[in-house]
């Protein structure tokens, strides 16, 4: 595969209905791959679209009293509309009813026929209309029901044209075992087993007596092309046809993003056709099942997540969870609750909080001017931070080349976590209280290193979150018209825009809040909230929340029994994130880790006496078994214990850093 071009495709989706979350996953993956390789300086092309032929579509059109072309025209508009809502981009939206595609299919059919790779034969077997295929014994149950669609098959006998898969099968098995068709280990084994057990050849036509909705065979006017043969050829149509594909650098660096359920078609039949045509076989990026609540999404289970369920959360929330939880090829378990929690933890509390803290302190202590490094005063933690950040671009490149996108995100978030810990240890808010040159230089170094990490991360995850990372990079003074050079820029850790005056501090990712008990219950269910409650947009918002202080110093003493006291569980917590609450003069919003009890959102009325930066990564005491309290700005899930100091300030009770997170105060 060359280092100048990349051609990425999704499967062309079957035009039998509207998109679901699985379609969004594949399309998002194509977009992420495209942007990543663009940022490495490569020319790219992307293709998605609809597979619009076949008996199933013809039958559906009849059931709604429409012509097949009218039905697919309407669906194509709907698919484009939904893709637009998620800001998905593509160079080609392929439709198999287009004149260009029909011409390409006709030409390829004739070439394969003239070569002797297509012949006429008769077949009797069990046919699944939904699969649009004859099934083998392994693909049916004891009642001859399709294992995928759980419906009875039809016993059919008919004459069709066949493609000689067996002629190319030994060569295909060899390519599979060498990892040249798919490189993901689990799918090498799965595809090899499919190839070694495959018998016979591939039926590539259907008689017009059964269906007329297809591309007519050039050598027999009584047959139309089988929908799968027709559909696979769309990838060549996207290059400009068979002749263009012979010499195209895009075709020679093509990657098909496909679901594991269509592995046989893309990993066995498609290579056979390409070998017949003398074309290079693209590599496959196989995706796993999309689960919800531990089960494969299914209309019968009621756990399908529709685009309408995801829109209120936004594309970034969906993308972060889908590609943070598992690498492509592994199954991904999505619920609205998981998507919300991961967004808040990774984006709002992760890079969003790091950007807010760093840029706010630059504004406060350096009048908004990015400080220069003081390399001569660099400490060991800073050298290690710089080394980790400088090595990250190569690690992310390798991860992408191997379709390990979750690993790429994990390595990036490890850098963010290290930077958060570094800031907590260096306490820049304390350094800012001193006016001496040494403290000033240390403060400059802390903020310069934090800025460099933000710049590095901004370039490396722009493929996932393009709009927000563009905002971040622009805020840092970077030229986002040079994104084709992003990885080279990210390699130079120290190349920050020192002296650049911040014009804006972006709020990159605002937390997604659950604003009602019913919404919280809906989020915890694998069934989408819009299905459970009939309301999606009212269940969540991205705005913040007035309340009273979380605790205050007692003025009188009231005796209670030991039994009463034992009801209160006070635990050690670590403040992971702290931020000002917009619209409140009293509150801080805290994200506190209680170890095995997980993360809690807690509102504390101590904003007057302490800054968010002074709280992060500190060990505190939390009353952990209080009932969740609904406030104006959200739900508070505990109480931060505070007390009044000698100077009148109300401050948290900090505890020894050696105390175990989540442990119960005794």
Describe the residue ranges of each PLM region:
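Cys/His-rich short segments
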Residues: 115-169
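Helix-rich, typically C-terminal accessory recognition domains appended to large enzymatic cores
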Residues: 120, 325, 339-375, 388-495, ...
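A glycine-rich helix N-cap at a beta->alpha junction
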Residues: 75-89
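Secondary-structure transition/capping motifs at alpha-helix termini
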Residues: 1-2, 35-43, 64, 85, ...
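N-terminal catalytic cores of NTP/NDP-binding nucleotidyl/phosphoryl-transfer enzymes
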Residues: 2-75, 94-110, 114, 131, ...
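Intrinsic disorder at enzyme termini
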Residues: 472-564
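Structured secondary-structure scaffolds
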Residues: 2-48, 100-104, 155-364, 408-412
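Phosphate-backbone binding interfaces of nucleic-acid-interacting proteins
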Residues: 535-666
């Amino acid at each position: 595969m060359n280092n100048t071009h990349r051609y990425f495709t999704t499967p062309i989706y079957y035009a039998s209905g509207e998109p679901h979350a699985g379609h969004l996953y594949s399309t998002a993956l194509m977009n992420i791959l495209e942007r990543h390789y663009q940022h490495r300086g490569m020319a790219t092309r992307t293709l998605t679209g609809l597979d619009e032929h076949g008996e199933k579509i013809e039958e559906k059109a009849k059931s709604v009293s429409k012509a097949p072309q009218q039905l697919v025209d309407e669906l194509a508009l709907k698919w484009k509309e939904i893709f637009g809502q998620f800001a998905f981009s593509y160079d080609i939206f392929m439709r198999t009813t287009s004149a260009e595609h029909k011409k390409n299919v006709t030409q390829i059919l004739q070439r394969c026929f003239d070569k002797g790779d297509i012949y006429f034969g008769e077949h009797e077997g069990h046919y699944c209309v939904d699969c649009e295929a004859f099934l083998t014994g392994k693909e049916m149950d004891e009642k001859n029901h399709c294992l995928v669609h759980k419906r009875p098959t039809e016993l059919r006998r008919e004459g069709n044209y066949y493609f000689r898969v067996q002629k190319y099968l030994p060569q295909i098995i060899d390519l599979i075992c060498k990892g040249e068709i798919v490189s993901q280990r689990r799918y090498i084994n799965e595809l090899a087993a499919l190839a070694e057990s495959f018998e016979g050849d591939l039926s590539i036509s259907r008689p017009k007596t059964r269906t007329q909705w297809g591309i007519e065979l050039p050598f027999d006017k009584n047959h139309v092309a089988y929908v799968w043969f027709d559909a696979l050829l769309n990838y060549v149509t996207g290059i400009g046809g068979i002749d263009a594909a012979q010499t195209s650098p895009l075709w020679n660096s093509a990657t098909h993003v496909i679901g594991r359920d269509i592995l046989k078609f893309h990993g066995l039949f498609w290579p056979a056709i390409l070998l017949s045509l003398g074309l290079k076989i693209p590599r496959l990026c196989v995706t796993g099942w999309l689960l919800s609540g531990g089960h494969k999404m299914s209309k019968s289970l009621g756990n399908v997540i529709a685009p309408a369920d995801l829109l209120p959360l936004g594309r970034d929330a969906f993308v972060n969870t889908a590609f943070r939880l598992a690498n492509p090829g592994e199954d991904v378990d999505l619920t609205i609750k998981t998507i919300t929690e991961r967004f808040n933890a990774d984006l709002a509390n992760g890079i969003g909080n790091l950007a807010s803290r760093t840029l706010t302190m630059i504004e406060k202590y350096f009048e908004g001017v990015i400080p220069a490094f003081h390399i001569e005063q660099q400490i060991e933690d800073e050298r290690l931070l710089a080394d980790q950040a400088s090595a990250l671009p190569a690690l992310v490149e390798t991860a992408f080349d191997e379709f390990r996108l979750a690993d790429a995100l994990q390595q990036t978030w490890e850098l963010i976590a290290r930077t958060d810990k570094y800031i907590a240890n260096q306490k820049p808010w304390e350094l800012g209280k001193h006016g001496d040159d040494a403290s000033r230089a240390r403060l400059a170094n802390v903020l310069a290193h934090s800025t460099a990490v933000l710049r590095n991360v901004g370039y490396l995850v722009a493929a996932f979150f393009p709009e927000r990372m563009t905002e971040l990079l622009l805020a840092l003074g970077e030229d986002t018209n040079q994104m084709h050079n992003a990885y080279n820029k990210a390699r130079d850790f120290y190349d920050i825009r020192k002296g650049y005056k911040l014009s804006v501090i972006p709020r990159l990712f605002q937390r997604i809040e659950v604003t009602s008990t019913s919404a919280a219950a809906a989020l915890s269910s694998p069934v989408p909230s819009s299905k459970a409650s009939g309301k999606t947009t009212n269940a969540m918002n991205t705005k913040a929340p007035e309340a009273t202080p979380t605790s205050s110093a007692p003025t009188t003493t009231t005796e209670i029994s030991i039994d009463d006291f034992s009801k209160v569980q006070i635990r050690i917590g670590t403040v992971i994130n702290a931020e000002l609450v917009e619209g409140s003069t009293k509150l801080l919003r805290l994200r506190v880790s209680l170890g095995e009890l997980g993360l809690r959102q807690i509102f504390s009325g101590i904003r007057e006496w302490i800054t968010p930066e002074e709280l992060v990564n500190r060990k505190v005491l939390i009353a952990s078994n209080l009932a969740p309290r609904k406030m104006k700005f959200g739900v508070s899930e505990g109480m931060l214990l505070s007390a009044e100091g000698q100077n009148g300030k109300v401050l948290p009770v900090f505890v020894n850093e050696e105390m175990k997170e989540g442990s119960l105060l005794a």
